[in-house]
Regions:
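Bacterial N-terminal signal peptides
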Residues: 18-28
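Bacterial N-terminal signal peptides that target proteins for export
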Residues: 6-19
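Low-complexity, acidic/polar, glycine-enriched regions of mature
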Residues: 31-191
């Protein structure tokens, strides 16, 4: 009797181990990484100010994207940037932005949480960290694959008050609306 129980336990463990190995193999076979081409990609912020609007574009950022090759569903997205790399085509404004962010070398990041589809539109959710404050944001996005090239586009609405930042004011009457639009266009090779 003892031998039968021992054999059954060994077989159950062996079967479970084999099933886990098979599941890991299947999962890893479908997973892939996306090597982002920064020359073809863009992350941009649009802002409205008193009497005008302006845009800032990140000249550099880090991006690590993994996902399912077949469905193009992301499993991990990690973006990081230095605000010194956010250029608005106005050097004075860029310097003032660094002061507004608290000086030093402020950084930002985004970490993916999940995706879902609603009425034919795919949405992503992630944690955005700016000025030391983390907030969960949701936004629509699209992903297209042409051969090994993957293109991901999306737009997110932000309010800089949510990140503990003060109203941007110049010359006592000019302000920058706290509602910002961040758009991204990421292009990369699926590996």
């Amino acid at each position: 009797m003892f031998v039968q129980v021992l054999l059954r336990n060994i077989m159950n463990r062996t079967t479970r181990t084999a099933a886990c190995c098979l599941l890991a193999l299947i999962t890893s076979a479908a997973a892939g990484t996306l090597a982002i081409d920064k020359g073809k990609s863009q992350i941009k912020v649009d802002a409205k100010a008193t009497g005008h609007s302006f845009a800032g574009t990140l000249s550099d950022f880090t991006a690590k994207v993994t996902g399912d090759d077949a469905t193009m569903a992301p499993t991990a997205v990690d973006l990081g940037w230095k605000f010194a790399d956010l250029k608005t085509a106005d050097e004075k404004r860029d310097k003032e932005m660094m002061k507004w962010l608290g000086g030093g070398n402020p950084e930002g990041s985004f970490k993916f949480i999940k995706i879902w589809t609603d009425k034919g539109q795919t949405y992503a959710q992630g944690t955005l960290k700016i000025h030391g404050v983390s907030k969960t944001i949701d936004f629509p996005y699209t992903a297209k694959k042409d051969g090994k090239t993957v293109t991901i586009d999306g737009t997110a609405a932000l309010d800089y008050y949510d990140f503990g930042l003060p109203l941007i004011r110049a010359m006592a009457v000019m302000t920058v609306n706290p509602k910002l639009t961040v758009s991204f266009h990421l292009v990369g090779e699926a590996n």
